[in-house]
Design a protein with these regions (language model features):
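A conserved acidic beta->alpha catalytic loop
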Residues: 25, 40-49, 67
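Glycine-rich, basic loop-to-helix element that forms the pyrophosphate-binding segment
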Residues: 66-82
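Donor-binding/catalytic cores of nucleotide-activated saccharide
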Residues: 71, 92-212, 219-232
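Short aromatic/hydrophobic "clamp" motif used to bind/position activated sugar donors
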Residues: 87
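Membrane-interface aromatic/basic loop that binds lipid-linked glycans or pyrophosphate carriers
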Residues: 113, 279-337
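Catalytic core of nucleotide-sugar-dependent glycosyltransferases
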Residues: 216-224, 230-257, 273-302
C-alpha cells in the first residue's frame, strides 16, 4: 500500500480504556485503502504495547513512539509520515461510523474538494446527541465562499441565533494532504494556544478552493468530563490572550479588519461564556474565579466594541447581565445553561 486514499492519524495518550473501541471503528472501515498512524505520545499506560500489537496484526497500521509533547505535536508527527491522498485526525477516545472514510472520500473525489467534513454526534452515558450544522450537502467553492465559511467557523455574525454556526474541529473531516504539505501547515501546541484546531482551520481554509459539508453525523465525540478538554484553571484561562493574539494575526494576514472583526468578537464572546461556565463547573473557589473573569479588562474592551443590540434576545440578556459584574448572578446563569 504505497499511497492509500486516506491517512488516519490517531494521537494516543492515556486512553487504554477507549483505544479498542476507537480502533475497531477504524480497522473495519468500508474503505479499506487507508493507513492508520498511531502516535504514542509517551503514554504512561498500556497504550504503547497495544499500538505495537495492532501494527503486528494489520499491515495498514503504523506506530510512531515519541517523547510527550501534547496533542498538536503528536498530530504533526503523524503528518510527517503520512502518505495518503487525504488526511484525517481521530482522537483516540472517540470513534467513527464504519462508512465515514468511504463517504467523505467519495464526496471529495466527486467534487474535487480540498476538504470534506461531516456532522458530530456527542456520546455520553451510552446515548448519542447529533449536531447538524447543515441539513443537506453544502459546497463552498472558490476563495470567497471558502473564506466566508472560514469566518463563520471563527464566529457567526450578530444575527445568528447560534453562538457556533459551524463546529470548529479538525477531526470530523478529511483534508487534502497536498494542500497541507504544499503550504507547510502544522499544528501549534495546545499547551500554548487554547484552540489549536481553529488556528489550523484558518491556515487550511486560506489555501483551499473547495470545502464540502455533508449533513451525516459520522464522528462520535465522547463527552468525558475528566478529559483534558474539560478541565479548567486560571492557567488555561490565561491562554485566551495568546490564542486571540494569534487568531487575529492570522486573520489580519489575509483579510481587512472590517471583514473579520465581528466574527472575531463573537468568538471572543463565546470564550467569555465558556470561561465562566468552566470555572463554575470546576472544583475550586468558584466565586473568586468568576469575579476574576468579570474584572478582566479584556472583556471590558469587548463589551464596548460589540453591537449587542443586534444579538438574539437570549444572548442580549446574558451579556447585559454580565455587565453588572455580579459573580453570584453569573454562577446562577451558568448553572441554568
Amino acid at each position: 500500500m504505497e499511497h492509500p486514499k486516506v491517512s488516519v492519524i490517531v494521537p494516543i495518550y492515556n486512553v487504554e480504556k477507549y483505544l479498542d473501541e476507537c480502533m475497531l471503528s477504524l480497522l473495519n472501515q468500508t474503505l479499506e485503502d487507508i493507513e492508520i498512524i498511531l502516535v504514542d505520545d509517551e503514554s504512561p499506560d498500556n497504550c504503547p504495547k497495544m499500538c505495537d500489537e495492532y501494527a503486528n496484526k494489520d499491515k495498514r497500521v503504523k506506530v510512531v513512539h515519541k517523547k510527550n509533547g501534547g496533542l498538536g505535536f503528536a498530530r504533526n508527527s503523524g503528518l510527517d509520515v503520512a502518505t495518503g491522498e487525504y488526511v484525517a485526525f481521530i482522537d483516540s477516545d472517540d470513534f467513527i461510523d464504519l462508512d465515514m472514510m468511504e463517504h467523505l472520500y467519495n464526496v471529495a473525489t466527486e467534487y474535487n474538494a480540498d476538504e470534506v467534513r461531516c456532522g458530530i454526534k456527542f456520546y455520553v452515558g451510552g446515548k448519542f446527541t447529533e449536531r447538524h450544522d447543515v441539513d443537506k450537502l453544502t459546497v463552498f467553492r472558490g476563495k470567497e465562499q471558502v473564506v466566508d465559511f472560514m469566518l463563520d467557523v471563527v464566529g457567526p455574525l450578530p444575527k445568528c441565533k447560534r453562538d457556533v454556526k459551524y463546529m470548529m474541529s479538525s477531526c470530523c473531516c478529511i483534508h487534502s494532504r497536498k494542500v497541507i504539505e504544499d503550504n507547510h501547515i502544522r499544528f501549534l501546541s495546545e499547551r500554548e494556544c487554547l484552540s489549536e484546531d481553529l488556528i489550523w482551520d484558518i491556515d487550511l481554509f486560506s489555501k483551499m478552493n473547495c470545502v464540502v459539508y455533508v449533513p451525516e453525523c459520522h464522528y462520535a465525540y465522547r463527552m468525558n468530563p475528566s478529559s483534558l478538554t474539560h478541565q479548567y484553571s486560571r492557567e488555561k484561562y490565561q491562554r485566551n490572550y495568546n490564542f486571540f493574539e494569534i487568531l487575529e494575526e492570522k486573520l489580519a494576514g489575509i483579510l481587512a479588519k472590517e471583514k473579520y472583526e465581528l466574527h472575531l468578537l463573537r468568538s471572543q464572546m463565546l470564550y467569555f461564556r465558556n470561561s465562566i461556565s468552566g470555572f463554575v463547573h470546576n472544583n475550586g473557589n468558584v466565586k473568586d474565579d468568576v469575579r476574576y473573569v468579570l474584572n478582566d479588562n479584556f472583556w471590558k474592551r469587548l463589551f464596548s466594541l460589540y453591537p449587542f443590540k443586534r444579538l438574539p434576545l437570549k444572548q442580549r440578556v446574558y451579556y447585559t447581565l454580565a455587565k453588572l459584574k455580579s459573580p453570584t448572578l453569573m454562577i446562577i446563569l451558568a448553572k441554568l445553561k
